[in-house]
């Protein structure tokens, strides 16, 4: 879903829709899609008035799928959290003019996304690894898959999957041989 939306929005910037205008400044660099953990934290901070620390605690709870914590935080995200002295630890979206239905929808998006998000500072390293992996698989498919097969030697399901991939590429796989194998 998110990948398709990202690609569509990248090619058709006019199709980008934000559930609330406050999301534009946060998500415009990623074509209206949540990609980075930092974006989730920024949404908590800017839409609901969370502190940096509390936003990070919620981000970690989401990534670890701590449902009880997340449901409590949903209430705070939407309606705010009042301290014992009557002040607000966080305002909540409703107090900041965002309808509860919209706030709940944004929270749902963040919850489903959070377990797949990654740290923005790591994205360049991931991109380099992905690029190099794709290059090796494209230009050296037999050698790439040989290394891949070695890495999953104990998993017959993955071995079968990779051998099928080689067959699709019309690359022959030889059986092990005591006379010829290294």
Regions found by a protein language model. Give the residues of each.
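Noncatalytic, beta-rich nucleic-acid-contacting surfaces in large DNA/RNA-processing enzymes
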Residues: 1-182
């Amino acid at each position: 879903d998110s990948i398709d939306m990202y690609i569509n929005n990248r090619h058709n910037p006019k199709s980008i829709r934000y559930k609330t205008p406050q999301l534009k400044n946060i998500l415009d660099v990623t074509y209206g899609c949540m990609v980075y953990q930092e974006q989730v934290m920024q949404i908590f901070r800017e839409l609901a008035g969370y502190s940096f620390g509390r936003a990070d605690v919620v981000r970690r709870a989401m990534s670890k799928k701590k449902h009880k914590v997340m449901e409590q935080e949903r209430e705070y995200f939407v309606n705010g959290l009042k301290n014992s002295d009557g002040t607000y630890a966080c305002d909540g979206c409703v107090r900041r003019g965002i309808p509860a239905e919209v706030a709940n929808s944004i929270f749902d998006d963040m919850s489903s996304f959070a377990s797949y998000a990654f740290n923005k500072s790591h994205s360049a390293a991931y991109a380099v690894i992905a690029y190099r992996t794709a290059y090796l698989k494209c230009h050296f498919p037999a050698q790439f898959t040989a290394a891949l097969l070695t890495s999953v030697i104990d998993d017959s399901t993955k071995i079968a999957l990779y051998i099928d991939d080689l067959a699709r590429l019309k690359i022959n796989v030889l059986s092990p041989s005591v006379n010829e194998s290294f």
